[in-house]
Amino acid sequence: MTLFKVYARALRYLGAYKLRVSLVVVANIVLATITIAEPILFGRIIDAISGKGEVKPILFMWATFAVFNTIAFVLVAREADRLAHGRRATLLTEAFGRIISMPLGWHHQRGTSNALHTLLRACETLFGLWLEFMRNHLSTVIALALLIPTAMSMDLRLSAVLMVLAIAYWLIGRVVMSRTKDGQASVENHYHTVFSHVSDSISNVSVLHSYNRIEAETRALKSFADRLLEAQYPVLDWWAIASALNRMASTIAMMVVLIIGTMLVQAGQLRVGDVIAFIGFANLLIGRLDLMRQFATQIFEARSKLEEFYALEDSVREREEPAGNGEIKDVKGAIEFRDVSFGFGNSSQGLHNVSFSVKAGQTVAIVGPTGAGKTTLVNLLQRVYDAQGGKILVDGTDITKVTRKSLRRHIATVFQDAGLLNRSISDNIRLGREGASEEEMRRAAEAAAAADFIETREDRYDTHVGERGNKLSGGERQRIAIARAILKDAPILVLDEATSALDVETEARVKAAIDNLRQNRTTFIIAHRLSTVREADMVLFLDDGRVVEQGSFDELSHSNGRFAALLRASGILTDEEVRKAHTTEAA
């Protein structure tokens, strides 16, 4: 993407404020016009004084311009700041909404810290571009567009010097940008590495403390920062050279204007005021060209950040759901997988030709070794990912034909990690159903066996749970998560290792709450603790993404298959029980 396209797309975000931006454009035209007029007026005053002419009309005109200049400047300063700040806040909100609504598979592939870093840096970069566009870029472009024709109308010879100076600035900038393009892209990659390392370390700070990794991780960060500087310094060196060359060209141009102007005045071909005006033009041109150089540098440095953000936005729009998808309503909970397959790119993990059906209100236990595809299966049900083959039906409706939002409205999930927000207990429970009353929220807490410990807290339901619920115990966090699911009152329930991280006593309390939650709901239970799946109507044993055994708990436990082997390994079933079961069946 060229610099012009990067900049043009950045400015398109201001399209929502066309009227206000138009006012800023008009004000900048006024500022640029007055900027060009001032050197001419100053030259006329010099001529009037030296020729003993009338000065007052020129001074009055200058004073009038000063009034308009002040008004236009205040308008630009006020509106530019308000527009830039307002658009940044709006963009952050809009982009956040689009990004967070993306399928979890998209987030897993891209990485949370990467998307966050890209969004935040782009918002700040765009804010700077918008502010500079309205404060300086626009007036600079207009001033340059007016300056050259005005100067040429006064004297072509001195105008040629200004033209050569402008071309020199352009050539220097062009060369430097071509030499630093790859270097600046490398700098942005190093910034991402530094940010990801900091984010990763802070989010796992307890592990770093436990394994005495603080100093090692700090050294690693310093190493990443050193590499960043190694990539940054050559870019800075090139721009320093450009500044020196521009300054040299400006000085030479100013000297040439003075020399040629003096010769023309002595020859009687120009007035002193004209030379003064051209000196003002030269100073103005140098100042504006410096602004243009800074402007080009700003866009050049922003290029990699914005290209990544544009790619992020485009990928979000590509993954947005078709506008024609309808809503699924009045779900009873009958679910069918028809020859469903899904894969993770180059990974061998996934699902292969999975088929089964569940009646509304039944409980399905999904078991199998690590990496068998258990979580992938329930993720497909919730459209975290979309199946690459086959169909998933809810009450006979293909879930790819309905919106994710309407589908998930009918599914409540309790994860192994409760996933609490750094808000109050009440706020976390109310995530289950927006607009739930205080009474409904408290009833859900009671049903989840959470009310007792909540009432012992000083602030009760207003107690803040801390980051990811770190002010609560594991059992307390899980009971709040269960209360959230109860409040949602969805016909389909997913329990993803909901009790695996709890001790036996806490698990017993949480299991009672889960049993209450499961009533009259189609339930999927993922569990490594096989004792939790005894009451399942159906057990699916997955291995390598395939359903290798399927049936009731009793059927599979007496089949002497993979599931029975797991039961024996966990001590739930003995070899003697299996032998007796087979003897009974044979008889």
UniProtKB/Swiss-Prot annotation:
Residue stretches spanning the membrane: 23-43, 57-77, 128-148, 158-178, 248-268, 272-292
A Pfam short name: ABC_tran
Subcellular location: Cell inner membrane
Domain of life: Bacteria
Keyword Secreted: no
Reactions accelerated catalytically: [(1->2)-beta-D-glucosyl](n)(in) + ATP + H2O = [(1->2)-beta-D-glucosyl](n)(out) + ADP + phosphate + H(+)
InterPro entries: AAA+_ATPase, ABC1_TM_dom, ABC1_TM_sf, ABC_transporter-like_ATP-bd, ABC_transporter-like_CS, NdvA, P-loop_NTPase, Type_1_exporter
Domain ABC transporter: 335-569
Positions annotated to bind ATP: 368-375
EC number: 7.5.2.3
Keywords assigned by UniProt, alphabetized: ATP-binding, Cell inner membrane, Cell membrane, Membrane, Nucleotide-binding, Sugar transport, Translocase, Transmembrane, Transmembrane helix, Transport
Topological relation to the membrane, as annotated: Multi-pass membrane protein
Start and end residues of each ABC transmembrane type-1 domain: 21-301
GO molecular function: ABC-type beta-glucan transporter activity; ABC-type oligopeptide transporter activity; ATP binding; ATP hydrolysis activity
GO CC annotations, alphabetized: plasma membrane
Job description of the protein: Involved in beta-(1-->2)glucan export. Transmembrane domains (TMD) form a pore in the inner membrane and the ATP-binding domain (NBD) is responsible for energy generation.
Quaternary organization: Homodimer.
Family label: Belongs to the ABC transporter superfamily. Beta-(1-->2)glucan exporter (TC 3.A.1.108.1) family.
Family matches, as PANTHER family: ATP-BINDING CASSETTE SUB-FAMILY B MEMBER 10, MITOCHONDRIAL (PTHR43394:SF1), ATP-DEPENDENT PERMEASE MDL1, MITOCHONDRIAL (PTHR43394)
Domain notes: In NdvA the ATP-binding domain (NBD) and the transmembrane domain (TMD) are fused.
Name assigned to this protein: Beta-(1-->2)glucan export ATP-binding/permease protein NdvA
Source organism of the structure: Rhizobium johnstonii (strain DSM 114642 / LMG 32736 / 3841)
Taxonomic placement: Bacteria, Pseudomonadati, Pseudomonadota, Alphaproteobacteria, Hyphomicrobiales
